[in-house]
Amino acid sequence: MADTNVNGGTQQATGKLKSVESLDQTNEMERGLSNRHVQFIAIGGTIGTGLFLGSGKSISLTGPSIIFVYILVGVIMFFLMRAIGEMMYRDPSQHTFINFITRYLGNGWGHFAGWTYWAALVLLGMTEITAVSTYFITFFDTFGIDLTHWKWLIELCFLVSLVSINLIAVKVFGEVEFWFSMIKITLICAMIATAVVMIVIGYHYPAVQIHGVDHVSPAGHAGFDNLFADFSFAPNGWMAFLMSFQMVFFAYEMIEFVGVTVSETKNPRKVLPKAINEIIVRVLIFYVGALVAIMCIVPWTSFKPNKDGSFASPFIMMFQYAGLNWASALVFFVVINAASSALNSLLYSAGRHLYQLSEVSPNPMLNKLGKVSDRKVPARAILVSAALILLSPIVNAIPGVSGAFVLFSSASSAVFLFIYILTLLAHRRYRRSADFIADGFVMPAWKVLNTVAIVFFVFIYLTLFLADDTRNSAIAGLVWLVGFGGFSMLRERYRSRDLKAALEHKE
């Protein structure tokens, strides 16, 4: 698993590892991201709002077994990242891992994956900007300040601020993401430390009205026995247990973001392997550690839905049990930070993907977006992506259109599974190609691990059909795969035929 030959140049029987400098001859971006930036970007990509707000529902579905689900899904995502990392290690000048789908599966699948991934990023950005404003309003509501009527202005201010960060320089983006990640890490570590103290002193807490819960939570105590009380591997049945996999998967979504930063990272062949190999450690600390701490304080049987079907944040529950009545404001401040980080990363990634698509497009209009600014960032592609994200409040306000938007937004999460599967298939082709570098950042037991990951992602997609709130998304995703995927393949077939005819005519 250790990477060797960091500086490149060693000839292998199956390929030659070129130096980063020689590969960068066509890379117009600036390598402004340091090791510190990338490591914290990787952490930020692992920790999303799902951990802070959504884990309550997943705990209620499976109880302590959710820890097993988080570990299993985390390991599979690690396999995916090792596959991406191996290909990126060979060619760190690529702006996106999607390029490897084009290289090893053909232009048809590359066209499908590239535009699908970019569209999914924009749709996720539209939902994320809505979420940021909602969390911002909730945060101030804890102080009795109503900002509901200023929702559109909040969204505009956040988006303008984050776009400005992305336009200044990649180093500035990296620095902002560093601090976003630091805030998330601090809250999780503070929560785990608080739980440890409560367990050690045998803390007992009274019945309390938790913010965001429409019923009084019962009195209890802190201890490891809460973790195993009334234990059942599938307390709500196997159907609920299977549904928890999709929820956990979406919590890990965008973990691949660190792979998009490679073309702008200093010493990528040294930094990338470290960032990827530490994914397992991050999963154990920030997900497993946090969930164990929560369930040692709050019995898993206490996670019950409100009348409207929503769940309170486990972090808010735990801190309020500890007597911190301002816990709600604290957690929502960090959630605003986490959502802002996600939106910031989506802008970065969407800009790079649109830049890459525009650069290779035969369309002259799109070619204009495939340019970098004087600050070495794809400014035009970022601005176009941001402009589409800014349509979110308008789309949400139009009757009929808003319902379709919700469907497509949720379907965009589902199509990430298609992208992941195509990436793994591209990795299989890479390993069998003359491009393979035996002394690179090689994925061990790749035939087994790659296959396991593909099968697992297919399984996750099938679980989307189990729940009413994800079934339509799964169907919409399949329609997109057949429709746009078929169009992309036919487009490439006709382009290849026309090119062949032109060459024959020239001869």
Describe each PLM feature range.
Residues 1-56, 60-62, 78-82, 491-507:
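Membrane-interface "cap" regions at the ends of multi-pass membrane proteins
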Residues 24-29, 66, 143-150, 182-329:
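Helix-loop-helix junctions that connect adjacent transmembrane segments
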Residues 96-102, 106, 138-143, 215-221, ...:
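TM-loop-TM module centered on a large, flexible mid-protein loop between adjacent transmembrane helices
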Residues 150-218, 249-253, 276-280, 409, ...:
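Membrane-interface loop-to-helix entry segments
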